[in-house]
C-alpha cells in the first residue's frame, strides 16, 4: 500500500509540472522592429512575471512597458536594454524608446 501511495503522489506531481511547463512558454514573443533597433523589443501577457527586453519572457507572465505602465505594481525601463517587472496586465518593453 505504501508503494501505491508513493506512485500516485509521483503521478500527481508530474501532472502539475506539465501545467507549469505549458504556462512557461506562453509569453515568448518578438518585436517587429527588433532588428532595426538592434534587439531589446518585445511584449508579453500574463500574471506576475519578469520581462527582459531581449525578446524573451522568462516566466510566461510579463506585464510591463518601457514607461512602467501595464502592470500592478508595474515597473519598467526603456533604455537600450528595456526591461521591467509587473503584476497582472499586459504591456511591452522596448529598447528603441
Swiss-Prot record:
Q: Which family does it belong to?
A: Belongs to the hssA/B family.
Basic residues composition-biased segments: 72-84
State what protein this is by name.
Answer: HssA/B-like protein 44
In this chain, the stretch annotated as Disordered covers 1-22, 62-97
- Biased-composition ranges, Gly residues, are 85-97
> Which Pfam families does the record match to this protein?
Coiled
- A GO BP entry: sorocarp development
Amino acid at each position: 500500500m505504501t508503494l501505491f501511495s508513493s506512485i500516485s503522489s509521483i503521478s500527481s506531481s508530474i501532472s502539475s509540472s506539465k501545467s507549469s511547463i505549458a504556462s512557461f512558454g506562453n509569453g515568448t514573443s518578438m518585436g517587429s522592429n527588433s532588428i532595426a533597433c538592434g534587439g531589446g523589443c518585445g511584449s508579453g501577457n500574463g500574471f506576475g512575471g519578469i520581462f527582459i527586453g531581449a525578446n524573451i519572457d522568462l516566466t510566461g507572465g510579463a506585464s510591463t512597458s518601457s514607461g512602467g505602465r501595464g502592470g500592478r505594481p508595474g515597473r519598467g525601463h526603456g533604455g537600450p536594454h528595456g526591461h521591467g517587472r509587473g503584476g497582472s496586465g499586459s504591456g511591452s518593453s522596448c529598447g528603441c524608446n
